Amino acid sequence: MSLQDGEARAVLMRAVLYMAVATFLFATMNALAKYIMITPGGASIGALQVTFCRYLSGTIFLLPVLLWARVVPRTRHPEKYALRAGFGAAGVVLMFLAFQTIPLANATAIGFSSPIFTMILAVLFLGERAGRMRWLAAAIGFSGVIAIAGPDGNVLNTGSLIAIASALCMGVEVAALKWVSRLGDKPLVMLFMGNFLGAVLVAPFAIPTWVWPEPWQWLPLA
């Protein structure tokens, strides 16, 4: 094996590790979201409020990171970031709504279909190519989603449809992220814009129905 092949393999292994860690963190975030929404003895916090708090926490967390990195969160294309943030926020809200109606494992498994939608959108709108094996893998993956969504034959149950809609929105968000990445902005700017604009877009819907959390709910809410 050549040195170049070894370096490529190392990069691939790091990418797999990062993806595994990210998947674990997202699963933990989802579990905490469902916990604070359905646990008896706590305030009845809705999906919109949980989504707003998550985006707001992300924005606040990134501020000192931007300061340390000396990066100004500025872009010449705010409308493109707003489009991406809108689909992302819709996907998160819908996923949290799905948690309230179907088991967490089912909703999370259905959510993993978002890369299928991303691949389709990337081929249609971003000029990317997908070989036969990828299309075959996507078809098999979506068949698994259908099986999870309706194990009793009832695929059109409300919770599963909400989770599929969430996966579609998140797939659009990832495709839009690839789109905005071509604008030349730094990764920190893209990350900050996603959280900040997500909070701004959800705020008008979350604040009017705000429920003050119990003290123990603040940490998982963030």
For every predicted segment, state its role.
Residues M1-L48, N154-W179:
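Glycine-/small-residue-enriched transmembrane alpha-helix faces in small-molecule transporters
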Residues R14-A22, R70-L94, T158-S166, W212-A222:
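Loop-to-transmembrane-helix transition segments
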Residues T23-A31, L56, L63, A85-V93, ...:
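Hydrophobic/small/kink-forming positions within alpha-helical transmembrane segments
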Residues I38-Q49, L94-G111, G184-L188:
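Structural motif at transmembrane-helix junctions in multi-pass transporters
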Residues A43-A90, C169-E173, M193-P208:
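Transmembrane alpha-helices of multi-pass small-molecule transport proteins
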Residues S57-F61, I110-L124, A139, F196-L201:
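Alpha-helical transmembrane segments of compact multi-pass small-molecule transporters, enriched
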Residues L97-Q100, S114-L136:
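C-terminal transmembrane-helix exit sites in multi-pass transporters
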Residues M133-G150:
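Hydrophobic transmembrane alpha-helices of multi-pass small-molecule transport proteins
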